């Protein structure tokens, strides 16, 4: 919010007075907060189970991995919605927006955020089907 507060669009409207930018900012904030809550809640649940001497089931691990990946992609999609409304100056190397956008997208390229295998394995679990041994590594 701080970066956008005093920005003026090409049409001369302050970002703080543009209802479309404000709507996108509120929606993005909600998506990021929702992703954060889902991620922390799931990790806390698994942590508590381990702390109590238990071991998470393959299903619990699979669901948490699915949520972890989805949370990352949701948060970056929310960032994209803000970036798309940040004007041409956002892409300048001197802009913190550019750095945040780049870092978020690079983070999604890490193997841990690869959707395909994680979602595939999770769907097999949820359908009660056997997960091939090679896919268990992504869980």
Q: PLM ranges: what are they?
A:
Residues 1-48:
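Extended amphipathic alpha-helical segments enriched in small hydrophobics
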Residues 26-33, 65, 69-76, 102, ...:
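Generic structural signal for well-ordered, non-transmembrane alpha-helical segments
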Residues 77-84, 115-119:
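Short segments within alpha-helical structural elements
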Residues 13-16, 20-23, 30, 52-66, ...:
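A structural signal for alpha-helical segments
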């Amino acid at each position: 919010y701080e970066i956008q507060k005093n920005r003026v669009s090409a049409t001369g409207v302050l970002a703080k007075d543009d209802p479309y930018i404000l709507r996108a900012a509120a929606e993005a904030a909600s998506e990021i907060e929702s992703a954060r809550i889902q991620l922390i809640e799931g990790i806390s649940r698994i942590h508590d189970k381990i702390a109590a001497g238990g071991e998470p089931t393959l299903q619990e691990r699979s669901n948490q991995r699915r949520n972890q990946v989805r949370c990352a992609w949701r948060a970056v999609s929310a960032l994209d919605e803000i970036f798309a409304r940040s004007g041409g100056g956002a892409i300048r190397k001197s802009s913190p927006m550019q750095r945040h956008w780049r870092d978020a997208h690079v983070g999604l390229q890490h193997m841990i955020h690869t959707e395909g295998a994680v979602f595939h394995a999770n769907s097999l679990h949820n359908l009660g089907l056997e997960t091939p041994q090679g896919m268990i590594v992504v869980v």
